[in-house]
Amino acid sequence: MNGYLMLFIGTVLVNNFVLVKFLGLCPFMGVSKKVETALGMGMATTFVMTLASICAWLINDFILLPLNIPYLRTLAFIFIIAVVVQFTELVVRKTSPALYRLLGIFLPLITTNCAVLGVALLNVNENHNFLQSALYGFSAAVGFSLVMVLFAAIRERLAVADVPAPFKGSSIALITAGLMSLAFMGFTGLVKV
């Protein structure tokens, strides 16, 4: 049980997918202008990353490895992610049309989010078992969502702040992301992974 807690904390804080591994930067910068959209995107990505990591583990261990075709991993994982994203898009469209409109083009773009493919491939490289794979996917998504919501809240504050003209827009956003990354580096010694 302690190992699973360390995996969760390590993935969310110490090895954060956005600020440490630099995966998922496109939605991090693109959807983080408002907290509502960042939260919605975070929830959708959490669902997709968790489900995709579970499906990827199942496909890898029960199809790719027994048939001795591990070279098809990337292609199979991309297909799995595309199917999971389409399922998520249908669910969000039916359950929350307002969120579906807010997320717009970014919902189908979860398919191309490198963090989703990254979690599936890293699960295989780390030789996680089924429970560890599910927890790793969920933890990576929680870390992604946490950083996106925090970044969106900071960007909302910066939108009304008196920022010097050369730093307005993307410049201050990148500086803020860098400072957040430095802040998360403070968690480095928290967990040995």
Curated annotation (Swiss-Prot):
This protein's GO CC annotations: plasma membrane
GO biological process, one term: electron transport chain
Subcellular location: Cell inner membrane
UniProt membrane topology term: Multi-pass membrane protein
Enzyme Commission number, as recorded: 7.-.-.-
Recorded superkingdom: Bacteria
Class in the EC hierarchy, top level: translocase
Record-annotated membrane-spanning stretches: 5-25, 39-59, 62-82, 102-122, 134-154, 171-191
InterPro entries the record matches: Ion_transpt_RnfA/RsxA, NqrDE/RnfAE, NqrDE/RnfAE_oxidrdctase
Keyword Transmembrane: yes
Main location: membrane
Keywords: Cell inner membrane, Cell membrane, Electron transport, Membrane, Translocase, Transmembrane, Transmembrane helix, Transport
Family: Belongs to the NqrDE/RnfAE family.
Assembly, per entry: The complex is composed of six subunits: RnfA, RnfB, RnfC, RnfD, RnfE and RnfG.
Function: Part of a membrane-bound complex that couples electron transfer with translocation of ions across the membrane.
Name under which the protein is recorded: Ion-translocating oxidoreductase complex subunit A
Native species: Sodalis glossinidius (strain morsitans)
Gene transcribed to yield this protein: rnfA
